[in-house]
Amino acid sequence: MINTRKSHPLMKIVNNAFIDLPAPSNISSWWNFGSLLGICLILQILTGLFLAMHYTADTATAFSSVTHICRDVNYGWIIRYMHANGASMFFICLFMHVGRGLYYGSYTFLETWNVGVILLFATMATAFMGYVLPWGQMSFWGATVITNLLSAIPYIGTNLVEWIWGGFSVDKATLTRFFAFHFILPFIIAALAMVHLLFLHETGSNNPTGISSDADKIPFHPYYTIKDILGALLLILALMLLVLFTPDLLGDPDNYTPANPLNTPPHIKPEWYFLFAYAILRSIPNKLGGVLALVLSILILVLMPLLHTSKQRSMMFRPLSQCLFWLLVADLLTXTWIGGQPVEHPYIIIGQLASITYFLLILVLMPVASTIENKLLKW
């Protein structure tokens, strides 16, 4: 008799995706982040659901409702801080996951990669709208600054911004719609993640060598289930260390001041995971130019398969490309630091240099290095 997990219509899907899935025998811990992102998403949806039970999306009561969650709701403080710091863990995993894809040439799975880029945009949009909900000073001014960027779009810009606001400034209508979108988007992300997985399972996983692993596959369970559980335990450990010891480490003190349209904070800045993009935005003195650079800094990922000039898929055996990759990582860390600094000398010039280096590395230096490495193969 055939096994139930192989015959049952629903169990069959789960079995083929997580149990009997043939996986490469040599995938390293860099392949753990996909499952960790799934865990982060589930955690965010669950904590978010419980927060939504007590939150009110109204300018008069939003800030108070968050205070009420932290003070009066049973274990409300831990739910709130798990949600806030869970977003940080989510983005750490996202950056690692994308970095892994760049290093090992996983972007050659076109559909999987492009759905992944859409997932990245959707997650960034969700995080931005979530940051607005507590209705603190940084929530309000962050929303004002970022939505205002759309006014740089020629001809329709101003109308578009007012349409998004639902009025002539960030107000009650804006907060209500942001809450609605912040609630629905994670479910869209979950659906997209399933599409992401569907496309991945059409080709099978990449591996550190970048060579086909069809000749050497092992079942996902128990080998990678146990490996994913270890990863999950480490993720939860890191998250709970943050939540229980330094819950406000990654937040902005300004967000503990209720939103006041009449008082602008001295330094408006987003959460840490957007600082690199914010630095690129600020480094261009022109509004439209800055917005374009901001969008392109993420959208450039779509071009990665086109910019791949190497005869090898992975960077494992390409020392020149490896150096440039880690230079790119250092560059992004520099820009993350700059994005959190005030707009003054020497930070302005450092930010501009970091932004130029970022685009130069991806568009010019890395493809050229790959071509040189191809030539070196003939020696």
UniProtKB/Swiss-Prot annotation:
Keywords: Electron transport, Heme, Iron, Membrane, Metal-binding, Mitochondrion, Mitochondrion inner membrane, Respiratory chain, Transmembrane, Transmembrane helix, Transport, Ubiquinone. GO terms for molecular function: metal ion binding; ubiquinol-cytochrome-c reductase activity. InterPro entries: Cyt_b/b6_C, Cyt_b/b6_C_sf, Cyt_b/b6_N, Cytb/b6-like_sf, Cytochrome_b, Cytochrome_b_C_euk/bac, Cytochrome_b_N_euk/bac, Di-haem_cyt_TM. PROSITE patterns: CYTB_CTER (PS51003), CYTB_NTER (PS51002). It is found in: Mitochondrion inner membrane. The chain crosses the membrane at residues 33-53, 77-98, 113-133, 178-198, 226-246, 288-308, 320-340, 347-367. One of its GO terms (biological process) is mitochondrial electron transport, ubiquinol to cytochrome c. Binds 2 heme b groups non-covalently. Heme b b562 binds at H83, H182. Gene3D superfamilies: Cytochrome Bc1 Complex, Chain C. It is a multi-pass membrane protein. Belongs to the cytochrome b family. The cytochrome bc1 complex contains 11 subunits: 3 respiratory subunits (MT-CYB, CYC1 and UQCRFS1), 2 core proteins (UQCRC1 and UQCRC2) and 6 low-molecular weight proteins (UQCRH/QCR6, UQCRB/QCR7, UQCRQ/QCR8, UQCR10/QCR9, UQCR11/QCR10 and a cleavage product of UQCRFS1). This cytochrome bc1 complex then forms a dimer. Heme 1 (or BL or b562) is low-potential and absorbs at about 562 nm, and heme 2 (or BH or b566) is high-potential and absorbs at about 566 nm. Component of the ubiquinol-cytochrome c reductase complex (complex III or cytochrome b-c1 complex) that is part of the mitochondrial respiratory chain. The b-c1 complex mediates electron transfer from ubiquinol to cytochrome c. Contributes to the generation of a proton gradient across the mitochondrial membrane that is then used for ATP synthesis. This is Cytochrome b. The gene is MT-CYB.
